Amino acid sequence: MIRRRGNVEIRVYYESVRPSRSRSHLKPSDHQEFPGHHVSPGSPGFPESPGNREFHDLPENPGSRAYPGTRDPHDPHGCPGSLDPHGNPAQPAGLPSPVPYAPLGSPDPSSPRQRTYVLPRVGIHNAPASDTRAPKRANSRHRADRPPESPGSELYPLNAQALAHLQMLPADHRAFFRTVIEVSRLCALNTHDPPPPLAGARVGQEAQLVHTQWLRANRESSPLWPWRTAAMNFIAAAAPCVQTHRHMHDLLMACAFWCCLAHASTCSYAGLYSAHCQHLFRAFGCGPPVLTTSRGQGGWCN
């Protein structure tokens, strides 16, 4: 029978047991089958038996020769364990007579006490606790501010939040920066196919236009001259040769870097450019502006 209490399982076993029977009905030879049985005084295993050689080798001790079944003639009252002349146990003087015990008889199979009865055994086991945890569910919904991951998820980090970044740029840089964001979002939606063939050329043309306007307004008077010159040289060389999304990604990041140089001390994308535009940081000695050099030098088209 099994009972449960919380996480504990109690099992009750029933075992058939017969009461022990008296050995008085067994033969003398049957006593040898039970270890620890008592031997009679006349048996070879008894210490006083004539067949026990170890007993005869012991030294005589007159004070230790009072054995059960004998009586000291000098002791009128007897000693415990001695027998009287009639063969009954002797009782020392001053002690009450022992209560006689009824002899053990042979077991009666018809007696209710001798019948087989059942003893229960109880075993406590730890029942296996059921798993109450809710099954794991795949989260198929993505956060609203994070697009689903794709093989090209490490590309095109410029997202919709960059539109708010527009308000921190000078007015003559905002149109070009908006074009960079739109092309970046368009390419990020379809990274399994090659980027649009005309997108790179369009970005390159607008970059040269805005850079020419900036040169006219800030010729040799801006501390950003080396870095913007390095960025525009890279853009002019890369725009005609865009073939993969990695090429498009590098081109767009260089364009965004060119725009954000206008507020380099407060730009929130500084960490982003540190990861993707390190090749533009060492701009000292980059050479003359791109408008005075031949197109295509130093790019992927060589």
UniProtKB/Swiss-Prot annotation:
Protein location: Virion tegument; Host nucleus matrix
Superkingdom field: Viruses
Stretches for region Disordered: 1-155
Induction info: Expressed late in the infection cycle.
Gene Ontology CC annotation, any one: viral tegument
Post-translational modification: Phosphorylated.
Zinc finger (unnamed): 255-267
Keywords: Host nucleus, Late protein, Metal-binding, Virion, Virion tegument, Zinc, Zinc-finger
Basic residues bias spans: 135-144
Compositionally biased region (Basic and acidic residues): 27-36
Name of this chain's protein: Virion protein US10
Organism: Human herpesvirus 2 (strain HG52) (HHV-2)
Phylogenetic placement of the source organism: Viruses, Duplodnaviria, Heunggongvirae, Peploviricota, Herviviricetes
